[in-house]
Amino acid sequence: MSMAVYNNQEGEEGNPFAGALTEFSQWLWSRPLGNPGAEDAEEEAIAAQEELEFPEDEAQARHSCLQRTTSWATPKEVSPSGRVYQTVRHSRMEYSRPTMSIRSQASYFSSSARPLPPPPVPSLMSWTPIAKYHPSSPTSTSSKFLRAAPKLIKRG
């Protein structure tokens, strides 16, 4: 069993799903994984964070990821490998500049009889070109250029 929840948002105001996803993510992350009474339970936790700054645009990008995997022994009837693996991950990316703020977050939960390869975590380097500022102000054209007659270019 695995489940992934994604939420892309530009500002959280007016987004009815923003609060629900945040609550679900907090519940999922705080949820005890594994079999609390198992003596041979193994747990692995990973926390990663990266930041980029774009001084020319006065912009910042941040990515944080928390992942926890727990495994424990189980009868062969339940799992052919003899272990059960549960993984929970929460990933959050933010991009902000003076005129805009974008947030994206994803939560992931899986339970399996064998360790699953980790789902790809979006890299900040691949995400920021999408959000990076590109000047979009309308071009201003002086009226003297509009009145000038077009020049004819002769090619020999």
UniProtKB/Swiss-Prot annotation:
| Residue segments, region Disordered | 55-81, 133-156
Q: Is ATP-binding given among the entry's keywords?
A: no
Q: Which residues carry this modification: Phosphoserine?
A: 71, 79, 137, 140
Q: Where is this region: RNA-binding?
A: 57-156
Segments carrying the region annotation (Homodimerization) are 38-54
Q: Which InterPro entries match?
A: Luteo_VPG
Report the subcellular localization.
Host cell junction, Host plasmodesma; Host chloroplast envelope; Host Golgi apparatus; Host mitochondrion outer membrane
Q: Name one GO biological process term.
A: transport of virus in host, cell to cell
Could you list this entry's UniProt keywords, alphabetically sorted.
Host cell junction, Host Golgi apparatus, Host membrane, Host mitochondrion, Host mitochondrion outer membrane, Membrane, Phosphoprotein, Transport, Viral movement protein
PTM annotation = Expressed as a nonphosphorylated 20kDa form and a phosphorylated 22kDa form. Phosphorylated by a host PKC-related kinase. Serine phosphorylation is required for plamodesma targeting.
Additional detail: Poleroviruses are transmitted by aphids directly into phloem tissue. The virus replicates most efficiently in phloem companion cells and then moves through plasmodesmata between companion cells or into sieve elements for long distance transport.
Domain notes, please? The N-terminus is involved in homodimerization. The C-terminus binds ssRNA. The C-terminus is phosphorylated.
Chain's role: Together with movement protein P3a, facilitates long-distance movement of virions in host. Transports viral genome to neighboring plant cells directly through plasmosdesmata, without any budding. The movement protein allows efficient cell to cell propagation, by bypassing the host cell wall barrier. Binds ssRNA.
What is this protein's name? Answer: Movement protein P17
Question: Which species?
Answer: Potato leafroll virus (strain Potato/Netherlands/Wageningen/1989)
